[in-house]
From Swiss-Prot:
It is an enzyme of class 5 (isomerase). GO terms for molecular function: isomerase activity. Belongs to the Diels-Alderase family. It comes from the Eukaryota. Keywords: Isomerase. This is Diels-Alderase mpsD. Diels-Alderase; part of the gene cluster that mediates the biosynthesis of macrophasetins, 3-decalinoyltetramic acids (DTAs) which feature a tetramate (pyrrolidine-2,4-dione) unit connected to a decalin fragment and that have potent bioactivities. The PKS-NRPS mpsA together with its associated enoylreductase partner mpsG incorporate one unit of acetyl-CoA, seven units of malonyl-CoA, and one unit of L-alanine to assemble the linear tetramic acid intermediate corresponding to the backbone of macrophasetins. Pathway: Secondary metabolite biosynthesis. Pfam families: DA_C, DA_N. The gene is mpsD. InterPro entries: DA_C. The keyword Isomerase applies. Its EC number is 5.5.1.-. It comes from Macrophomina phaseolina (strain MS6). Transmembrane segments: none annotated.
Length: 396
């Protein structure tokens, strides 16, 4: 098992490959990496996103340190990037890194993913970077990847207090909303298409760290972040595959008004005394993903019985932002879909004259194939690769 590195400066090289165990950094700041080396089982991600509040433009980007990907022959250090432009065009990029470099100052934590084409990662001419303020007041994702994406997504938090539900979400899954809500500014260009995306909107920043490979942990996951007038809500939910929790929905929600928390809970059990949320799928709308999940939106309720408070929001998918199959059909029918959605709602009986607010949000839905299916898929790929490289039979 790899030994923990001390907090400070270190780097992770993709070429070194994963170890069997976890190299914990033991750093107290959740924006800092949890692991200082690649692991076959332990992995983590940083997600930053922003959306213009008419729903016409947005950016979502996720940075990964994920040694479990090597099981499938995939690169362990990578970034997924999706941008929606006002004319409806979509810029999608999968950026592969050779390394991750980590350093911190009194003011910030900096993580840099130098691009794989840099060989050993010693050149800095092509990279993707996150810089997060130590107090989580700001975060900036910067890209200098010629031919793909250049520019930045800058987030300035309006979240007034730390996430009270940070930590374990379910078996082998931990999560923190670094910024439940933030002002977002995008200034990005895409050399391949000659396009540019500039907008101001709202967004947030989340962190996840896992202690098992993704398909072993969960069968489904749903990510929600929405904004409507003074309100912002955010959630991550997973349906566990682990032990006695198999089939259990593990989810948390937080609701802000003007940056101040008015609701936070991990309970979706209806109660006359305890705070709870209810997230119900909607069907029959015009926009849905192409996979097994046919959800076209959600009805979301936050209830605080003792305080006599109730907030309700309608979330309706407006655009499919991305759609990625997780294997070839018919063996695999599951996938990863993202949506830009319209958000409408407010406090039930609480706002003046029952005022309803409108805005936009983004939704991510993932359904994972069974681990046995992925193992079968890996075997089929290996057989196909062997057949492709086998010498042709000699002519008689």
């Amino acid at each position: 098992m790899a030994h923990p590195q001390s907090p400070g400066e270190f780097q992770i090289l993709a070429a070194e490959g994963p170890t069997a165990g976890a190299a914990w950094t033991r750093h107290s700041n959740d924006a800092y990496p949890k692991y200082s080396a690649l692991s076959k089982t332990h992995w983590e991600m940083w997600m930053l996103e922003g959306i213009e509040q008419t729903g016409n433009a947005g950016v979502t980007v996720t940075f990964f340190i994920d040694g479990s990907q090597t099981f499938h022959g995939n690169d362990p250090l990578h970034i997924t990037f999706h941008a929606l432009l006002p004319d409806g065009a979509i810029e999608k990029h999968h950026l592969i890194a050779a390394a991750v470099r980590v350093r911190e100052t009194d003011a910030s934590i900096v993580l840099e993913w130098p691009s794989k084409e840099n060989g050993d990662g010693t050149e800095a001419n092509s990279f993707s970077r996150i810089e997060v303020a130590q107090d989580h007041s700001s975060a900036t994702a910067t890209f200098n990847v010629p031919g793909a994406v250049q520019g930045s997504l800058a987030l300035t938090s309006y979240t007034r207090s730390p996430d009270p539900t940070a930590g374990a979400l379910g078996p082998a899954v931990s999560h923190r909303q670094i910024m439940t809500g933030a002002h977002a500014e995008s200034d990005l260009s895409f050399p391949g298409s000659g396009r540019r995306l500039r907008f101001a909107g709202k967004g947030g920043h989340d962190r996840c760290w896992m202690e098992a490979a993704f398909p072993a942990i969960l069968s489904d996951t749903t990510y929600v972040r929405g904004h409507a007038g003074p309100y912002t809500f955010a959630s991550l939910g997973v349906v566990s595959r682990m032990g006695e929790s198999r089939g259990r929905n593990c989810q948390k929600f937080r609701l802000l008004r003007d940056g101040v928390e008015v609701f936070a809970s991990k309970s979706d059990t209806v109660s006359l005394t305890e705070d709870y949320f209810v997230l119900r799928s909607s069907h029959g709308g015009p926009v849905k993903g192409p996979f097994l999940d046919t959800t076209t939106g959600y009805r979301l309720d936050f209830v605080r019985p003792r305080a006599g408070k109730h907030w309700a929001f309608e979330i309706a998918h407006e655009k499919v932002w991305w759609s990625m199959p997780l294997g070839p059909p018919p063996l695999v029918r599951e996938g990863n879909s993202g949506f830009v959605s319209k958000v409408r709602g407010g406090e039930v009986g609480g706002d003046a004259d029952g005022e309803t607010f409108e805005g936009a949000g983004d939704i991510g839905q993932i359904q994972m194939p069974e681990l046995s299916t992925l193992v079968e898929l890996k075997t089929l790929k290996a057989k196909a690769a062997a057949a492709a490289t086998a010498p042709a039979p000699a002519e008689q």
